[in-house]
């Protein structure tokens, strides 16, 4: 079993508990001889900047799969629109005081501060005809289309890179990484990961956060899989 590329989440996976980049994970990624793609719920310009500063090739999945690009100098491709998300936001705003995060730069979803009752909001949304879901990444709550996720983003980006999604190993920690694990050929959850992502993972590390990412990569190398 040999994989051709790696796709890895940022926050909670290649960071420390305080959200600083884990230098050991950064160094480990830079030693690999396969393409490394960053996948995040954050905005495209953030993902691109992180890729560049880490020293990777610029291929990223952003906005939970809603935005992808293969290089720094190639325009991002966006899937879906904000129209349905805005309708859901307007509806929920009648019940909660909501604060948008990075609204100027988000093109395919709405990210909210985590200061309202998520389960109550989900129950309220079920009464409406929106094809929308609320996803908690532990750093923000995202109003997003049910037709967009990191797995779909990986399939799109893999094709743009000349690969299949199954050619990738995926590493992550949050519930929004689950579809990416299912699309990839192999999924590794770090120890601090959500139960949802651990359930679909092929391997769960003993270490957490960036230490877990290092452990994951070393596990793959020791088996000759990358």
UniProtKB/Swiss-Prot annotation:
Write down the SUPFAM superfamilies for this protein, in alphabetical order.
HAD-like
* One Gene Ontology term of the molecular function aspect: phosphoglycolate phosphatase activity
Superkingdom field: Archaea
List the active-site residues: 9 (nucleophile)
Annotated Mg(2+) binding lies at 9, 11, 173, 177
Cofactor field: Mg(2+)
Q: Which residues form a coiled coil?
A: none
Instruction: Write out the residues that bind substrate.
Output: 150
* Its EC number(s): 3.1.3.18
User: InterPro entries of this UniProt entry?
Assistant: HAD-like_sf (IPR036412), HAD-SF_hydro_IIB (IPR006379), HAD_sf (IPR023214), PGPase (IPR006382)
This protein's GO cellular component annotations are: cytosol
Which reaction is this enzyme known to catalyze? 2-phosphoglycolate + H2O = glycolate + phosphate
Keywords assigned: Carbohydrate metabolism, Hydrolase, Magnesium, Metal-binding
What family does this belong to?
Belongs to the archaeal SPP-like hydrolase family.
PANTHER family cross-referenced by the UniProt entry: HAD SUPERFAMILY HYDROLASE-LIKE, TYPE 3, PHOSPHOSERINE PHOSPHATASE
Q: What is this protein called?
A: Phosphoglycolate phosphatase
């Amino acid at each position: 079993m040999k994989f051709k590329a790696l796709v890895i989440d940022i926050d909670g996976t290649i960071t420390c508990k305080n959200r600083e980049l884990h230098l050991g994970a950064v160094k480990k990624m830079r030693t690999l001889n396969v393409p490394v793609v960053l996948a995040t719920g954050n905005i495209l310009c953030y993902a691109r900047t992180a890729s560049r500063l880490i020293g990777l090739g610029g291929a990223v999945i952003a906005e939970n799969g809603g935005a992808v690009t293969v290089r720094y100098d190639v325009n991002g491709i966006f899937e879906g629109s904000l129209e349905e998300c805005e309708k859901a936001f307007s509806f929920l705003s009648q019940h909660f005081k909501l604060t948008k995060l990075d609204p100027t730069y988000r093109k395919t979803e709405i990210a909210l501060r985590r200061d309202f009752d998520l389960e109550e909001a989900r129950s309220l949304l079920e009464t409406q005809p929106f094809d929308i879901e609320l996803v908690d990444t532990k750093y923000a709550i995202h109003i997003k289309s049910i037709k967009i996720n990191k797995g779909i983003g990986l399939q799109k980006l893999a094709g743009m890179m000349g690969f299949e999604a199954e050619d990738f190993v995926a590493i992550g920690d949050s519930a929004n990484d689950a579809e990416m694990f299912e699309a990839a050929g192999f999924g590794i959850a770090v120890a601090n990961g959500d139960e949802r992502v651990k359930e679909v993972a092929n391997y769960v590390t003993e270490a957490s956060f960036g230490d877990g990412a290092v452990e994951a990569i070393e596990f793959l190398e020791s088996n000759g899989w990358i």
